Amino acid sequence: MEASAGLVAGSHNRNELVLIRGHEEPKPLRALSGQVCEICGDEVGRTVDGDLFVACNECGFPVCRPCYEYERREGTQNCPQCKTRYKRLKGSPRVPGDEDEEDIDDLEHEFNIDDEKQKQLQQDQDGMQNSHITEAMLHGKMSYGRGPDDGDGNSTPLPPIITGARSVPVSGEFPISNSHGHGEFSSSLHKRIHPYPVSEPGSAKWDEKKEVSWKERMDDWKSKQGIVAGGAPDPDDYDADVPLNDEARQPLSRKVSIASSKVNPYRMVIILRLVVLGFFLRYRILHPVPDAIPLWLTSIICEIWFAVSWILDQFPKWYPIDRETYLDRLSLRYEREGEPSLLSAVDLFVSTVDPLKEPPLVTANTVLSILAVDYPVDKVSCYVSDDGASMLTFESLSETAEFARKWVPFCKKFSIEPRAPEFYFSQKVDYLKDKVHPNFVQERRAMKREYEEFKVRINALVAKAQKVPAEGWIMKDGTPWPGNNTRDHPGMIQVFLGHSGGHDTEGNELPRLVYVSREKRPGFQHHKKAGAMNALIRVSAVLTNAPFMLNLDCDHYINNSKAIREAMCFLMDPQVGRKVCYVQFPQRFDGIDVHDRYANRNTVFFDINMKGLDGIQGPVYVGTGCVFRRQALYGYNPPKGPKRPKMVTCDCCPCFGRKKRKHGKDGLPEAVAADGGMDSDKEMLMSQMNFEKRFGQSAAFVTSTLMEEGGVPPSSSPAALLKEAIHVISCGYEDKTDWGLELGWIYGSITEDILTGFKMHCRGWRSVYCMPKRAAFKGSAPINLSDRLNQVLRWALGSVEIFFSRHSPLLYGYKNGNLKWLERFSYINTTIYPFTSLPLLAYCTLPAVCLLTGKFIMPPISTFASLFFIALFISIFATGILEMRWSGVSIEEWWRNEQFWVIGGVSAHLFAVVQGLLKVLAGIDTNFTVTSKATGDEDDEFAELYAFKWTTLLIPPTTLLILNIIGVVAGVSDAINNGSEAWGPLFGKLFFAFWVIVHLYPFLKGLMGRQNRTPTIVVIWSVLLASIFSLLWVRIDPFTIKARGPDVRQCGINC
């Protein structure tokens, strides 16, 4: 199927496959009405085959051969009418920039060699020129395209596919990957080349020339190595490329440890804080409060929990590291001049569900930044998963593909950053800086106008989608949209761009752009985002099968066009790359207010915690901005290092005499576990049935899983691949397989990212944290208080689900011992942190209770005991200061993180624990909603920040605020009434209460909104809570003056 052939929809279970023609039929070439050249006025002429000479196959603009060749040699090399780059035609010489066209069998004209010289070269047995040309042609053509042996999509029509409804002929070629690697399977996809021999093979002349060529190469190698007979190599014969080769052999990345002057004091303070914490808890346990045992016991339980939580969070940050990448070495190693790029291919996944909550313009910018990435276009394929089967998403993607033909060449011509047009044109910087091209300003202005028109078209589609027709959506050709019922529709695939038709305005190829919507039927579990990502894994394996995959949320665009190259510096490094399962990039965000009121940037986690994990076994997977190794997602174990010598032991102890297992934990043979692939000898040990039970019943997909270096399986026709692609996204494909259990994104939690990374680390893989100077990806964050709390609620609920699942880090993964202990601490902390909301809520209530009752959580302390409290506070602040020192996090970002830890802990985390317990104990499932992505407001950039949206998550923090404020008023009033003696004990209680209020201050500002006016709903809640505590106040009666007089028992007065 060609890129413009149309939408393919089908269901494997129902044996249906239909081809729906797109919105517009392919435009025919312009009719050649005349035979006069529009440039010089001469006749156009004919080709050597007698056909009319056509210079441009796109528009058919009449140009004669001399003008055509002159324009290619001296001019712009573009058609004067449609501006498409002229391709080399048979009989014309090659010019710089031409691609390798395999269907042109025209060597003498291609290299501008006349017949006499060709004959002379054939008769000259010492002339090696033609031999080198033949060799160059052989290597060049073996690196590109598909030959006629594999089928030519433009000439060989495919047989019609019979469906349950109708028979539709499917013709054309599906744009399959040419070579996604350099493994043994890749070569079988290339065109079979018949070189042009200078003489008949097998003759003496051929053998003699081959021997001469071999001798010359051997002598050249010896001279470079300095072993030529007669002494050392001549300095004049020194090869200038040797230093470049030495540089290319260097590591592509290196680990940079934090300076010891920064990290050693930090570790010392951690140890001191641990010691002080032990003495502090010992003192608190041994000194109860007799008249306030419930308050004392509650505070002790909370403080012990906080201590355990701090240990789990702190010690995974013991080995923080930085990393450096060397992009120039990557290019020297895999991108040599004059040779095809050897960089591995990458499949990029973009997931979206609801276009009304995830605006199509946001998704379009993400897709445009992918298509314009700085990476070989034949190595990039973009798959967009539309899990809502929305026609709006489909149409907007079609518009995006058309706009990409203009946007991509503009980005690459002027090397602009970022390559998402919305954010490029909105950035407030000097766009003329470092731009010396004379036409830049003019073309930038024109491109901005083109983008504004593109936005108008997208917004028109969005406006049209607001009113759904009663009969459902109808495509422009009159066909009903297959996804009108979002819960019951066939699988759909549409290729918008690709090698068979995806060219930009300058005639250069564009990366593939594929629309995918998996099949959904009632009664089948779809597993939300994790299921959609697994469907993308399978369909990409069938169509392109790149060895690496990058997944992005629809609102995360590529901010650094070299981001993929940064990841390849780790994944393709010969020394350490084979054990790396994924490269995680930090999340950076646009559109956040300057003070980051609700800690949206999450800098403490991304710049401190993740750096610490990188020094252990690698960072956790955070759901987006991550480049995966495909083999790791298939459940394979990492390659093993050199085996140690076997230890000679007796069989007296069962642990020493165990029989070696034939299969690993995941049921993989040792050949797979050790090498990531299958040995030819051991391949027969695992039957096809076992593979299908693991990966599913698709022969094409199962074959692709055995290809570690990627590439499309050999002998695959476009029709078969198309049918398999529909098959692997069918709703019942995963039944009775390991998908979601051991393969791909793991099911069982709405935070599938944590589970997926955890499974990989348990198998022994390690991950890498990459922080380039320019942020690799940027996204949008919910700056509204209610949206932010709902987002945190979803994360916390996912952690609770993992804690109660069979993959809980407390119990899972001990058998193989591949997960390091500090890494396990981090995963345990990731799953239990929502439970901290219970002690945190109790601890934040204690100050108000103490102020209202006149009691406290600890007895009066001595001077010596006060040293424990002073030392504890100093160690807490010292740890934070030293963390900020080695990480570069500002004090404002650190403080915002502390504040939102309390805000989220007493609201979203608390609700997550309750919902998680209801789901586990009562089976009540809670559906999460997709966080809305804002498109921006031209009138006020932060209008969403001040918008008030009521949610039940606001009730607990509001109650805490009012309770502590009432407590402060009551405590001060009591001290005023009872004299100066009450101020001493009151100071500790007030400090405790103000600690809670200060941490909840951003929440209070969020309630006040822009006008500093409390909303009505909050006023009602405040009055209600105030009434309740007023009744409590009357019961306590703190304002009654307590009489201080003689004891009646002593004076004998009968009162």
From Swiss-Prot:
InterPro entries in the cross-refs: Cellulose_synth (IPR005150), CES_Znf_RING (IPR027934), Nucleotide-diphossugar_trans (IPR029044), Znf_RING (IPR001841), Znf_RING/FYVE/PHD (IPR013083)
A family per Pfam: zf-UDP
Catalytic activity: [(1->4)-beta-D-glucosyl](n) + UDP-alpha-D-glucose = [(1->4)-beta-D-glucosyl](n+1) + UDP + H(+)
Binding-site positions, Mn(2+): K529, D553
Cofactor(s) required, per the database record: Mn(2+); Zn(2+)
Phenotype upon gene inactivation: Plants develop a brittle culm (bc) phenotype with a reduction of up to 90% percent of cellulose content in culm.
Parts of the chain on the Extracellular side: 290-291, 853-860, 921-951, 1005-1013
Active site: D387, D753
Recorded superkingdom: Eukaryota
SUPFAM superfamilies in the record: Nucleotide-diphospho-sugar transferases, RING/U-box
Record topology, Cytoplasmic segments: 1-268, 313-831, 882-899, 973-983, 1035-1055
Entry keywords, A to Z: Cell membrane, Cell wall biogenesis/degradation, Cellulose biosynthesis, Coiled coil, Glycoprotein, Glycosyltransferase, Manganese, Membrane, Metal-binding, Transferase, Transmembrane, Transmembrane helix, Zinc, Zinc-finger
Main localization, broad class: membrane
The keyword Glycoprotein is annotated on this UniProt entry: yes
EC number: 2.4.1.12
Protein known as: Cellulose synthase A catalytic subunit 9 [UDP-forming]
